[in-house]
Amino acid sequence: MNKMERQQQIKRIIQAEHIGTQEDIKNHLQKEGIVVTQATLSRDLRAIGLLKLRDEQGKLYYSLSEPVATPFSPEVRFYVLKVDRAGFMLVLHTNLGEADVLANLIDNDAIEDILGTIAGADTLLVICRDEEIAKRFEKDLAAGL
């Protein structure tokens, strides 16, 4: 089996199953008679451009879907360790001393649907225009964790 055929099989597996680890993908391939090393599988996944997302229970899984356009600058995801939502507000958890940096990044993005931010030492409160927007931002930020 050549590289292209193997990558097509991986895509098919990802679309058919809720796969969370490379080991799971490797096991599915082995069941189909395809033996692959961890290094080769890792290169294949990178070439395919799989995304690692979180489901409603917080479990990671691979997805082929294209990333949703985000209103946040790429640096924002670097600082976020955890996201919680309470109605129309988000609570973003960071490392100690990084919440104010994250607040500045979000404020500088000038996102119309964010009314304001309040930063502590390791926690940032983001006030969104409404609950639906908060849900969308929560999903967007959580997908990058």
From Swiss-Prot:
Subcellular localization, as worded in the UniProt entry: Cytoplasm
InterPro entries in the record: Arg_repress (IPR001669), Arg_repress_C (IPR020899), Arg_repress_C_sf (IPR036251), Arg_repress_DNA-bd (IPR020900), WH-like_DNA-bd_sf (IPR036388), WH_DNA-bd_sf (IPR036390)
Gene3D superfamilies associated with the record: 3.30.1360.40, Winged helix-like DNA-binding domain superfamily/Winged helix DNA-binding domain
GO molecular function, one term: DNA-binding transcription factor activity
Primary residence: cytoplasm
Pfam families xrefs: Arg_repressor, Arg_repressor_C
Pathway(s): Amino-acid biosynthesis; L-arginine biosynthesis [regulation]
One GO cellular component term: cytoplasm
Record's signal peptide: none
BP-aspect Gene Ontology terms: L-arginine biosynthetic process; protein complex oligomerization; regulation of arginine biosynthetic process
Keywords in alphabetical order: Amino-acid biosynthesis, Arginine biosynthesis, Cytoplasm, DNA-binding, Repressor, Transcription, Transcription regulation
NCBIfam families: argR_whole
Family statement: Belongs to the ArgR family.
Role played: Regulates arginine biosynthesis genes.
Name assigned to this protein: Arginine repressor
Organism: Streptococcus pyogenes serotype M3 (strain ATCC BAA-595 / MGAS315)
Taxonomic lineage of the native organism: Bacteria, Bacillati, Bacillota, Bacilli, Lactobacillales
Gene, per the UniProt record: argR2
